A protein has these predicted regions:
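A conserved FAD-binding loop/helix module that cradles the flavin
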Residues: 104-125
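Predominantly flavin-linked oxidoreductase catalytic cores and closely associated redox partners
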Residues: 1-76, 86-94
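Flavin-binding catalytic cores
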Residues: 51-81, 92, 99, 120-144
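Conserved aromatic-histidine-acidic binding/catalytic patches
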Residues: 50, 54, 111, 155
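C-terminal helical "tail/cap" subdomain of flavin- and related membrane-associated enzymes
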Residues: 124-172
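FAD-binding beta-loop-beta segment adjacent to the flavin cofactor pocket
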Residues: 24-27, 82-100, 110, 155-161, ...
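Generic secondary-structure boundary/loop-capping signal
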Residues: 14, 82, 104-105
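Short acidic (Asp/Glu) and glycine-rich catalytic loops that position anionic groups and cofactors
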Residues: 40, 100-104, 143-147
């Protein structure tokens, strides 16, 4: 989160995927989510191989984006965070005494990285079946969603340069 001394942001307008940045042969975009006229969350997102160390200059990327793309020279950083969402299927445990949850339990949509709603749904299921939890079924996304995620990830892997246009058309 950044804060500016002047009112710069329109808190009614968000920018979800700004691809106007260096892609480095992967998929890279920024979010700008204003909280008020002088506070906003600015986030950089990479859809890439986590092993690629050249992408790890996040602070510099954010600084360049804020100053060059948003035109903000005077700001302070209130909060920072870093995270990574795996966009691949986890290998699930074969141990019937382990009930994996979250990303480890296959609850992350591989095409979006979203996990929260699936965790909520599965948590309700676990609570409802807590007395017979060892017999409870393993969480699984529907076959349709698994297929669509695989198609998406294949296109992402083979044609990362096309992803900005694909995302734009998806949300048009």
């Amino acid at each position: 989160e950044i804060e500016t001394p002047k009112n710069i942001f329109d808190e009614e307008i968000i920018n979800l995927m700004d691809f106007n940045c260096d892609q480095r042969k992967d998929v890279h975009f920024f979010y700008t989510l204003p909280f008020s006229k002088n506070k906003a969350l600015i986030e950089t997102t990479w859809l890439s191989d986590l092993e690629d160390q050249s992408l790890r200059d996040y602070d510099l990327q954010l600084e360049n984006y804020i100053e060059n793309n948003l035109g903000i020279k005077n700001y302070k950083i209130n909060f920072t965070e870093k995270g990574a969402i795996p966009l691949f299927a986890p290998s699930l445990s074969n141990n019937d005494k382990i009930n994996n949850i979250g990303s480890a339990g296959g609850m992350t949509r591989l095409s979006t990285g979203y996990t929260f709603l699936n965790i909520q749904e599965h948590s309700r299921y676990i609570v409802k079946n807590i007395d017979n939890i060892t017999e409870a079924k393993i969480f699984s996304l529907g076959k349709k969603y698994q297929f669509l995620d695989k198609v998406f990830l294949k296109v992402l892997e083979k044609h990362p340069e096309k992803m900005p246009k694909i995302f734009f058309n998806m949300f048009k």
